Regions:
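N-terminal metal-binding scaffold of metallo-dependent hydrolase/deaminase domains
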Residues: 1-43, 54
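Metal-coordinating catalytic core of metallo-dependent amide/deamination hydrolases
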Residues: 130-259
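Active-site gating loops and adjacent loop-to-helix segments of metal-dependent hydrolytic enzymes
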Residues: 73-104, 150, 155-165, 223-251, ...
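C-terminal cap of metal-dependent C-N hydrolases
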Residues: 13, 371-431, 436
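Divalent metal-coordination and catalytic microenvironments
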Residues: 7, 25, 31, 53, ...
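His/Asp/Glu-enriched, well-ordered alpha-helical/loop segment
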Residues: 246-253, 295-383
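Alpha-helical scaffold segments that flank or form the walls of functional sites
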Residues: 73-144, 168-181, 436-437
Length: 437
């Protein structure tokens, strides 16, 4: 048996926090949670992870990001979505035909995810099969768990970033065969978005998904120009979502990123099918796409998660992903005539952790029977306050101000994958740089 000691803060339900000062998580030898303890046992005959005085938080689940766009983080932010794709995204993704380049970028990406406390992902690769396998290798090596998709696109990709329909299907099957060697990273079918895939390709992916029982991820109603484009390509579809539905790709556990402009009818289709929304507020604001009606989605019973959506999103930080969702909801409040309530810190923390972890079969918060996914945060170097803060206040402060320097330990799938507990805390303001590779 093992014991993780510290100040525990987790989100067992939307809007609810459980805070346990000087608490402990009792784990079995495989890192499975046996019990959440409100008092630390005095005599414990087993391995102890002593994080006394540190926050023990759930790790983050990033439910939508583009791995090959990592080199582009922070660039092209003055362009709308479709122009940005042509000018920045497609050219950099084409470079991942070079496996040496792919290895360097993906190794850095995987390490940075763990360093920021993100342990579960649903991720887009590029259309390159071998580079996608490299990405899966690097994620698994770093300790990340989750789903990765080889992108499918047989039209509108531009120079050097487009497959034939036959090639896309053939390479998808080759990739799926190779995926059997991975333990913690699994495949997810990934038609880039409707404008990038012909009907023949979409139909083939729907058939593969049904035959092999595979999940699907894509994009939905991110940008008004994109929606109009889909309408031109599929005049038989009254709404964007139907362009997936008619090929068997609109189903339980399908992840749809964005849904910024999903109206009541489209939201109803999302809920009824069990489709999962990956809300990406940083990306949506950066590309001026809009702000998703998250409060309405939650009120209507939709399953909402969060995504960093790099490189339209500007940070891999799970904590920034959470706080950006709060900021976006506040902007929505004063621009929407209906004045929907903004997200609270407990609600946003839930969306960035528990709600995403549920996609992988986890329970609510630190639930007994789940493999541990946690991050220990050293907040001792934050500015001294005139009074002692409660654990919920410390969580709020950490979410808004923490950096990777404050992350002192990370557990993924019950494994300790990052351990800096013996190092002195690094000031958040310290300048840091690291060479790629």
């Amino acid at each position: 048996m093992k014991l993780l000691k510290g100040d525990i803060v987790h989100a067992p339900a939307l809007g609810a926090l459980e805070t346990i000062p000087d608490g402990a998580l009792l784990l079995d030898d495989d890192g499975t949670i046996c019990e959440v303890l409100h008092e630390q046992p005095q005599d414990f005959d087993g391995e102890v992870f002593d994080c006394t005085g540190k926050l023990i938080m759930q790790s983050f689940a990033d439910m939508h990001l583009h791995a090959p766009q990592f080199p582009n983080v922070g660039t092209g932010m003055d362009l709308p979505l479709l122009d940005w794709l042509k000018a920045y995204t497609f050219p950099v993704e084409a470079k991942f035909a070079d496996l040496s380049y792919a290895r360097r970028v993906y190794r850095r990406l995987a390490r940075d995810l763990i360093a920021n406390g993100t342990t579960r992902v649903c991720m887009f690769s590029s259309l390159h099969t071998d580079a996608t396998l490299v990405l899966m290798e690097e994620l698994e090596r770093a300790g990340v768990t989750g789903f990765v998709g080889k992108v499918n696109m047989d039209r509108n990709g531009g120079e050097n970033l487009q497959e034939t329909t036959e090639e896309s299907i053939r390479e998808t099957l080759r990739w799926l065969k190779e995926c059997s060697r991975f333990t913690h990273i699994k495949p997810i079918l990934t038609p880039r978005f409707t404008p990038a895939c012909t009907d023949e390709l979409m139909a083939a992916l729907g058939k593969i998904s049904a035959e092999k029982g595979l999940y699907v991820q894509s994009h939905l109603s991110e940008n008004l120009d994109e929606i109009a484009w889909v309408r031109e390509l599929h005049p038989d579809c009254a709404q964007y979502w139907e362009s997936y539905d008619k090929f068997g790709l609109w189903k339980d556990h399908t992840i749809m990123a964005h849904c910024v402009h999903s109206d009541a009818r489209e939201r109803s289709a999302i809920r009824q099918a069990g489709v999962v929304v990956a809300h990406c507020p940083d990306s949506n604001i950066n590309l001026c796409s809009g702000i998703a009606p998250v409060r309405q989605m939650l009120n209507e019973g939709l399953w909402v998660t969060l995504g960093s959506d790099i490189a339209a999103g500007s940070s891999l930080s799970g904590s920034q992903m959470v706080t950006m969702s709060i900021r976006a909801s506040k902007i929505r409040r004063f621009t929407d005539p209906e004045k929907p309530a903004f997200l609270t810190v407990p609600e946003a923390y839930y969306l960035g952790t528990t709600s995403g972890h549920r996609y992988f079969g986890a329970g609510n918060g630190f639930a007994a029977g789940d493999r541990l996914h946690a991050v220990a945060v050293d907040d001792r170097d934050f500015t001294e306050t005139p009074r002692a803060l409660s654990l919920s206040e410390r969580l709020e402060r950490a979410l808004y101000t923490m950096t990777a320097a404050n992350v002192c330990a990370v557990w993924s799938e019950g494994r300790l994958v990052l351990d800096r507990r013996t190092a002195a805390p690094v000031r958040k303001t310290a300048a840091r740089s690291r060479k790629l590779g």
